[in-house]
Regions:
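N-terminal cationic and glycine-rich segments that engage phosphates or anionic surfaces
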Residues: 1-445
Length: 445
């Protein structure tokens, strides 16, 4: 009787040690996530659950991105998203700034080191701005009461305020560091994803309790939530596995006096969704940015400034038709844009030319690159529309069932994509580790 491949995972000392280290780091991260920012006002945090303001809606959106740490005003309230946002910004700047593109193309190894270094540098000011913006949002929950005691940027309040902001920045840096430890010594290249994953999954029990406490109709909402949850997982997995295979021909090679080695054929896989959940994260970051800026001017003494800031915060904080339509458009647009950027960076035409592989009927180099880009654009369209629909699904269901947008979802749409994508990547990693040890069966048939 053939043993299960899962048994070999635990039998292999190398894989077992990496899994145990990863689990240990995640436990440490979740313990730190329960440490609140010093001097926070519990009254404001308690009022958040019953808040129906635009600031409260925006905090709930940002809370999903932080993995639930923002609602408790933890020192990890910003999670690792300043780092991810910095990484996305630098990747998007690559095609615009030739020097960055040349650095990544000429020496990929050194280019990656340069990218990691500057991503860390850029994440610090982004974390600073995010911390100030989040504090400003919490200060709007209860008028006249701040989320941090002795909050202010002048006089005797300056030093405590600065210390709290630096504490939040340090929390983000700790989260990034723990993620990098996992990527290097645990499950490789999955550190930051697992940090986010652990935060999202940790919200499941609280979400179930929230649904169960929703009056006499809890069973109805729970049943709908479970059905939506399972159908969404199936749809996401189906899309993530969608691939278009482009045929490649490998010409024969001359082997001196031994004659000519016959060529062969292979395929180049192009995924329907090659960028995962990044468009959702970037679209949500962009659409919430105006509301974060507006939070500084809501209480302005100039009427038109205060009215404009209030309008922006009301329309960019989630729930309304304006927000839902704009969110859908941004997700679709960023899916196309980010796919184009990553496809350009891969430079399939030049790489295939160096390997001697050709697409039948196409000239090597630029012609091949343009042909593959057209195919990628065509198959990206259904993937982009699907991501857009997944993004606005909670709001559509909330409107149909006349409930809060989040009450019908055990996990948010972006959270589902992250969880499913992370699980898939972990399985791929474990299968590759088993293959290196001579075991070629799939973990999931």
């Amino acid at each position: 009787m053939k043993r299960s491949p899962w048994r070999y995972i635990w039998k292999s000392e190398g894989i077992r040690n990496r899994l145990l280290l990863t689990l240990g780091i995640l436990v440490i991260y979740r313990l730190i996530a329960n440490i609140p920012v010093p001097g926070f006002n519990a009254q404001v945090i308690a009022a958040l659950n019953s808040s129906r303001s635009a600031a409260g809606d925006l905090i709930n959106i940002l809370n999903v991105l932080s993995g639930g740490t923002l609602s408790s005003f933890s020192i990890l309230a910003m999670g690792v998203y300043p780092y991810i946002t910095a990484s996305i910004i630098l990747q998007l700047l690559g095609p615009i700034i030739p020097s960055i593109q040349d650095k990544l193309k000429n020496d990929p190894k050194e280019g990656r080191k340069w990218m990691e270094k500057w991503t860390m540098y850029l994440s610090i000011p982004l974390a600073f701005l995010s911390a100030i913006g989040q504090i400003g949002l919490f200060n709007q929950i209860l008028p006249g009461i701040t989320v941090l005691k002795n909050y202010g940027w002048s006089g005797s309040n300056l030093l405590p305020t600065l210390a709290n902001v630096l504490t939040m920045i340090a929390g983000t840096m700790i989260a990034i560091w723990l993620g990098q430890i996992i990527s290097e010594y645990g499950i490789q290249q999955q550190g930051l994803s697992l940090i986010i994953f652990s935060g999202i999954v940790s919200q499941l029990p609280a979400n179930v309790v929230r649904i169960l406490s929703d009056g006499s109709s809890w069973w109805y909402i729970l049943l709908i939530s479970i059905i939506i949850f399972l159908v969404s997982i199936f749809a996401i997995v189906y899309l993530q596995q969608g691939t278009r295979y482009v045929k490649l021909m490998i010409p024969g090679q001359r082997l001196g006096y031994r004659g000519v080695k016959s060529g062969g054929s292979t395929t180049l896989p192009l995924r329907v969704n090659s960028v995962g959940m990044i468009p959702l994260i970037f679209a949500q970051s962009l659409i919430t940015f105006p509301a974060l800026i507006a939070s500084f001017f809501v209480n302005s003494s100039t009427p038109w400034v205060a009215n404009t800031a209030t309008w922006i915060q009301n329309h960019f904080s989630g729930g309304g038709a304006f927000y839902v339509i704009l969110y859908f458009i941004l997700v679709v647009a960023f899916t196309f844009f980010y796919t184009s950027v990553t496809f350009m960076n891969n430079d399939y035409g030049e790489n295939l030319k160096k390997q001697g592989a050709v697409v039948p009927g196409r000239a090597a180099g630029t012609d091949t690159q343009n042909y593959l880009a057209k195919i990628q654009d065509r198959i990206t369209l259904p993937g982009a529309v699907f991501l857009g629909l997944i993004a606005i699904l909670p709001y559509i269901l909330g409107a149909i069932l006349r409930t809060n947008a989040n009450s019908t979802m055990l996990l948010s749409s972006s959270g589902l994509l992250i969880v499913v994508g992370c699980v898939r990547d972990i399985i791929d990693y474990l299968e590759s580790e088993l293959n290196q040890r001579g075991y070629d069966e799939k973990l999931i048939r």
